[in-house]
Design a protein with these regions (language model features):
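Glycine-rich dinucleotide-binding loop and its adjacent helix/turn
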Residues: 457-478, 504, 537-557, 581-635, ...
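Ferredoxin-type iron-sulfur electron-transfer modules and their immediate structural context
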Residues: 33-35, 56-57, 196-199, 203-320, ...
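A short, conserved structural fragment
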Residues: 101-112, 334-335, 887
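Short amphipathic alpha-helical interaction segments
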Residues: 86-102
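Short acidic, hydrophobic short linear motifs in intrinsically disordered regions
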Residues: 74-86
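Beta1-alpha1 glycine-rich phosphate/pyrophosphate-binding loop at the start
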Residues: 396-399, 405-406, 447-451, 487-555, ...
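A Rossmann-like FAD-binding core segment of flavoenzymes
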Residues: 533-582, 595-612, 634-744
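Short, amphipathic alpha-helical interaction segments positioned at domain boundaries
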Residues: 115-154
Length: 925
């Protein structure tokens, strides 16, 4: 053998190399021979690789290696046969065999007529490379085993994968569909059913550590799953697993519970595929982000190595592009596309590209997908999908919940919304409705009243009898995670983060310096827009999910981050928002009657202001300024006027907000900037002078205001409220930390993970983006929860295999809109009598059920899921997520259920390779 051979480059990141020392100048001869004997390469390679050498060197003594070299791979040996083979005394060889079995170099079974124990030198994968990784304590002591398993499950296949026929040729693992996805398949055969295998090995099951999860975690590419108990050994393998401290026996009901939880988490069922159609020894529940078996098909783009006999198919008439099937598809076969016809496609629904396959094509590394774990999580075709889902910062499945609402399935609609937005009742009142701005129906007449429908659905959360409390879906068999996580700030970002961490099985603790949750939702948004009991109701659900709230605690003042670390907190999500205001830097602004908008709104929302006398001048033109003006009007101020730099067309406040302010009695003057505040002899505000603003932005759209100082306007005032920006009040929160601050004192962080320069501190919401909308903060909180979950789980990557959140809207100018109903947009009733009687109560009523039915019928149904059959591996997970019965498995590839023994792999490969070569030569497909 060539020493220090370089191996093969697979264009994947080289992980675990730090665990592989250089080969010694004089390697142990017995170990070198063992490497030659056991490395089990499909294609000859004569290099001695470091991870192979050191794994065997750490696992075996020279004497053990010599015994192993005498054993033929996969041939069983009874104890008398081993005595004869080695010439060793029975007691001595039996102890050695048991020691090697405990390490993982050997396995054993009783598969003979006499039920005598027999030992087997297994192949590496599935086999000894896995066994070496299945006992966590052993793996942590010998991390080189992780690298060995990672490479042994990849390197030998690199050149053979294009020649693997349907069924897998006795190599590795085989996808077995979700049982209920094929219940009705009359053409199915027994080996395609999990129940068949559970019946075959009835009463002999053991749950064990997932070697793939454990291996990846040791090398820093874990998926944040708890590795324990996801793999189910069956038959004699169950005894082996238990007796060698790799697992524990489980009942059939416990097996069902593991399978159900795996499906809830989106894990793929696989069975071993090296013993033909009459034997398996394990059912695995695999996460594609770490699974080496699924990697064989995904990395090399050779699905024959994984797929079942089934292919997922979408009924487009039923599909509403909710994206649930797309999110769970391990192969990236399902992606969101469009249902509407396209002008570019000749008035037809567009055709979508299919993955090229090696069946009739020359195949080398240029055809591989080394970034498959991320690429498979891009959920939209480049040509786009429903604009509403794309435009929403949280990417809520708008089309899906509209359809559920249309069918009267309100609980399911609420559950679907909460997959991306845990505060739908709040957003139904205060969202800035970017989904409606993007709605294709707006090209016909008026956008669908999406937010009003959401508000109707989310009203269920305000009643304990109908509210939706999501179940915990956690990737651990322990019932949940015990890592302590602190969320600092109970605004929309913090609440969102708490919700999704609780849903994942954590018990996050939310620290809030105020006495009530909600942040600016509570202390900034007027109660006539958002009643505070709505906030309390949605927070109560998060509390019921397991989150703890500690009010009146300011982190940095009452308790420091280091003190929280000493209490056992492993990660922090800082989402304190922009709680301070900004002044204009003009004379007179330090007077008592000059305040900033956030302080004014906090006082009003805290109930500390009963009435406002005199004239109120508001400086600013955004939605917050509108809120100030409307509050002032409702508090009785005799004259309320807003002054802003922008023209009416440039005003940040929406047209609807401006209209409502005017209806409340506010006046709006555009094109003016503050110059000076005038005070009377007592030092109280008596007026303010403005100067004409001639330009707000430069040619590149950057703020660069210019003024005509000769064009002045003085107005009387009894108070001035500055609403020209907000600031972050850090206090001592970050004292001693490595968190870096940028423009506007906002925290700097990774744009995908929200991790700061202090690894255990994550940020989100306004402290990261600057002042924005609630839905932006909600989206950020969700992503932070993903990152924090990964961060606190040992050895996990924050980035690999996570949803890329890359959505593209279809081209609305390209869609064919020739036939549609002429129903006008429904409008929520405004109760003016209630508004007069209680000006600080909500007065815009919720849609009626009839209005919801009428409005949801206006949705054009832009999107649909598209399945690429060339990528589909037939796992059936998609069918478990669809609420519309729109996706099913069809048994289109019965040949993929051809299971052969490993010993028959070469004839299987050769036969298929010949057919493939002929196709390539003659250009057949």
């Amino acid at each position: 053998m060539i020493l220090n051979g370089p191996g093969i480059s697979y264009t994947e990141p080289d992980i675990g190399s730090e665990f592989v020392p250089p080969l010694p100048e004089h390697p142990r001869e017995a170990i070198v021979k063992l490497c030659e004997h056991c490395t089990n390469r499909l294609l000859h390679r004569d290099e001695l690789l470091g991870y192979e050498y050191w794994s065997f060197a750490e696992a075996a003594t020279d004497e053990q290696a010599e015994v192993l070299c005498k054993m033929k791979m996969r041939r069983p040996y009874t104890l008398p046969e081993m005595v004869k083979l080695t010439g060793m005394p029975e007691a001595q060889i039996e102890k050695m065999l048991d020691d090697m079995s405990y390490t993982g170099l050997l396995e054993y079974n009783w598969e003979n007529p006499e039920r005598a124990k027999q030992w087997v030198l297994p192949m590496l994968v599935p086999g000894s490379a896995e066994f070496l990784n299945m006992r966590v304590s052993q793996l942590e002591e010998h991390p080189v085993y992780a690298k060995f398993f990672e490479q042994a499950s990849k390197g030998p296949l690199s050149k053979a994968t294009p020649m693997v026929p349907p069924g897998g040729a006795g190599i590795g693992m085989h996808v077995i569909p979700v049982e209920k996805a094929i219940d009705a398949a009359s053409t199915s055969v027994p080996i395609e059913h999990i129940e068949h295998w559970l019946d075959k090995y009835d009463g002999k099951y053991a749950a064990s550590t997932c070697s793939c999860r454990a291996s990846r975690r040791v090398m820093g590419e874990g998926c944040a799953d708890d590795p324990a108990d996801w793999c189910i050994a069956v038959g004699d393998m169950a005894d082996y697993v238990v007796e060698t401290d790799r697992g524990h026996y489980v009942t059939r009901d416990e097996v069902y519970d593991i399978l159900r939880q795996a499906e809830d988490n989106g894990f793929v069922h696989q069975i071993t595929n090296i013993d033909g159609e009459n034997k398996i020894f394990a059912i695995c529940n695999c996460n594609v982000n770490v699974c080496y078996a699924l990697r064989t098909s995904q990395l090399f783009n050779t699905p024959n190595l994984s797929r079942s006999a089934y292919v997922a198919k979408v009924e487009k008439d039923k599909c509403v592009a909710c994206g649930r099937c797309v999110e769970v598809c391990p192969a990236g076969a399902a992606k969101l596309g469009q249902k509407l016809c396209s002008k570019k496609a000749g008035g037809q629904v567009p055709e979508y590209p299919r993955q090229e396959l090696p069946d009739a094509t020359k195949w080398d590394h240029t055809k591989w997908s080394p970034n498959y774990r991320n690429d498979n999580r891009i959920e939209t075709h480049e040509s786009g999908t429903a604009p509403c889902k794309t435009a929403c910062p949280a990417h809520v499945a708008v089309q899906g919940y509209l359809k559920l609402a249309a069918q009267g399935r309100y609980d399911e609609a609420l559950a679907l919304i909460k997959r991306e937005n845990p505060l739908p009742a709040i957003c139904g009142r205060v969202c800035n409705r970017r989904c409606e701005d993007a709605c294709t129906r707006g090209r016909v007449d008026a956008a669908v009243a999406i937010d009003e429908v959401k508000k109707f659905i989310a009203q269920r959360d305000l009643d304990a009898a109908t509210r939706y409390v999501p179940p915990v879906v956690t990737p651990t068999r322990a019932g949940g995670f015990d890592q302590k996580i602190a969320i600092i700030g109970a605004g929309p970002a913090g609440l969102s983060c708490a919700f999704y961490l609780a849903e994942k099985g954590y018990k996050p603790v939310v620290f809030e310096k105020n006495e009530r949750p909600g942040g600016m939702l509570t202390y900034g948004i007027p109660s006539f827009k958002l009643q505070k009991d709505v906030i309390e109701a949605e927070v109560e659900i998060i509390r019921l999910m397991g989150a703890e709230f500690r009010y009146g605690v300011e982190v940095g003042r009452d308790v420091t981050l280091d003190e929280l670390r000493a209490q056992g907190f492993k990660a922090f999500y800082v989402a304190i928002g922009c709680q301070g205001g900004r002044l204009a830097g003009i004379p007179g602004e330090d007077a008592e009657d000059v305040t900033v908008a956030v302080d004014f709104l906090r006082e009003v929302n805290s109930g500390k202001v009963d009435a406002l006398l005199g004239r109120t001048i508001v400086v600013g033109g955004g939605n917050v300024a509108i809120d100030v003006a409307r509050n002032a009007c409702r508090l009785g101020s005799e004259h309320v006027e807003m002054f802003c730099l922008e023209s009416e067309a440039q005003m940040p406040a929406s047209e609807e907000e401006r209209r409502e302010a005017v209806e409340d009695g506010a006046h709006i003057s555009c094109g003016w900037g503050p110059k000076e505040i005038h005070l009377d002899e007592c030092g109280r505000v008596c007026g303010i002078t403005f100067k004409r603003c001639t330009r707000v932005f430069d040619d590149e759209g950057r703020f660069a205001s210019e003024y005509d100082e000769s064009d002045l306007r003085r107005v009387d005032a009894d108070r001035v409220v500055m609403s020209i920006g907000q600031s972050i009040v850090w206090g001592d929160l970050l004292a001693g930390s490595k968190v870096e601050l940028g423009r506007g004192q906002g925290a700097l962080a990774d744009p995908q993970t929200y991790q700061t320069a202090e690894p255990d501190i994550f940020v989100g919401g306004d402290v990261y983006t600057g002042p924005s909308f609630a839905i932006d903060a909600i989206a950020a909180g969700h992503e932070a929860a993903v990152s924090i979950h990964r961060f606190v789980q040992p050895g996990s990557t924050l980035t690999i295999g996570r949803n890329q959140r890359r959505y593209t809207a279809l081209d609305r100018d390209d869609v064919v809109l020739e036939s549609y109903d002429n129903a006008s947009r429904e409008v929520a009733h405004v109760d003016r009598e209630r508004e007069k009687a209680a000006p600080f109560s909500e007065y815009i009523e919720t849609f009626t059920e009839e209005q919801v039915r009428a409005e949801t019928a206006r949705c054009l149904g832009c999107g649909a899921s598209i399945v690429d059959p060339n990528k589909c591996i037939g796992c059936g997970l998609c069918t478990t997520k669809c609420a519309f019965d729109a996706i099913h498995l069809d048994r289109d590839r019965p040949e993929c259920s051809t299971m052969v023994k490993y010993e028959q792999k070469l004839p299987s490969l050769g036969k298929y390779a010949l057919k493939r070569a002929i196709k390539i030569k003659f250009g057949k497909k």
